[in-house]
């Protein structure tokens, strides 16, 4: 190619339709607020724990489309969801309440906004004591909504 020439590439129009499989390794979502790992318990409760060996903190993130993810517990098989009151809970089946908009912030932490309640800006969040924070009580700029995806094993 000579200097000054421009090459144009065709846009990909095909869909890959990747299965909801394990194409990524499970992650731990570490919250900046108090140092808790997001946890989905077998009874559907969602909270945080500082115990890195807790099996309920291993989460699989599945991309529905660009920037949209499902978060599923590898231990319980439940999907993280947010109800109409902004309460986080574990759901046995994926639904519109389970879809979150994932965004990488300037500080290199991720935030997750409920897609169903995106116009209200309801984030996944953990309080300083490790309990889940209601969506309406969250807003941009809080440490409670900042999560760092970490590998399950430290090696």
UniProtKB/Swiss-Prot annotation:
Stretches the record annotates as Heparin-binding = 127-143
Q: Which UniProt keywords apply?
A: Acetylation, Angiogenesis, Cytoplasm, Developmental protein, Differentiation, Growth factor, Heparin-binding, Mitogen, Nucleus, Phosphoprotein, Secreted
Main localization of the protein described in the UniProt heading: secreted
Query: Which Cys pairs are S-S linked?
Result: none
Q: How is it modified after translation?
A: In the nucleus, phosphorylated by PKC/PRKCD.
Q: Would I find Secreted among this entry's keywords?
A: yes
User: Which positions are annotated as binding heparin?
Assistant: 33
**Oligomer status and interactors:** Monomer. Homodimer. Interacts with FGFR1, FGFR2, FGFR3 and FGFR4. Affinity between fibroblast growth factors (FGFs) and their receptors is increased by heparan sulfate glycosaminoglycans that function as coreceptors. Found in a complex with FGFBP1, FGF1 and FGF2. Interacts with FGFBP1. Part of a Cu(2+)-dependent multiprotein aggregate containing FGF1, S100A13 and SYT1. Interacts with SYT1. Interacts with S100A13. Interacts with LRRC59. Interacts with CSNKA, CSNKB and FIBP. While binding with LRRC59, CSNKA and FIBP seem mutually exclusive, CSNKB and FIBP may cooperatively interact with FGF1.
- Tell me its family: Belongs to the heparin-binding growth factors family.
Q: What is the protein name given in its UniProt record? A: Fibroblast growth factor 1
* UniProt organism field: Ovis aries (Sheep)
Gene that encodes it? FGF1
């Amino acid at each position: 190619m000579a200097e000054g020439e421009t090459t144009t590439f065709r846009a990909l129009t095909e869909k890959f339709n990747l299965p909801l499989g394990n194409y990524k390794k499970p992650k731990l979502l570490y919250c900046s607020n108090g140092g808790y790992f997001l946890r989905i318990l077998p009874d559907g409760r969602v909270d945080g724990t500082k115990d890195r060996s807790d099996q309920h903190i291993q989460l699989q993130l599945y991309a529905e489309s660009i920037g949209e993810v499902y978060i599923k517990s590898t231990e319980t098989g439940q999907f993280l969801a947010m109800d109409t009151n902004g309460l986080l809970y574990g759901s046995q089946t994926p639904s519109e309440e389970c879809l979150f908009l994932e965004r990488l912030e300037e500080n290199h932490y991720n935030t997750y906004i409920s897609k169903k309640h995106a116009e209200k800006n309801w984030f996944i969040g953990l309080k300083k004591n490790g309990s889940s924070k209601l969506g309406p009580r969250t807003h941009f700029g809080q440490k409670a909504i900042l999560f760092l995806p970490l590998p399950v094993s430290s090696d």
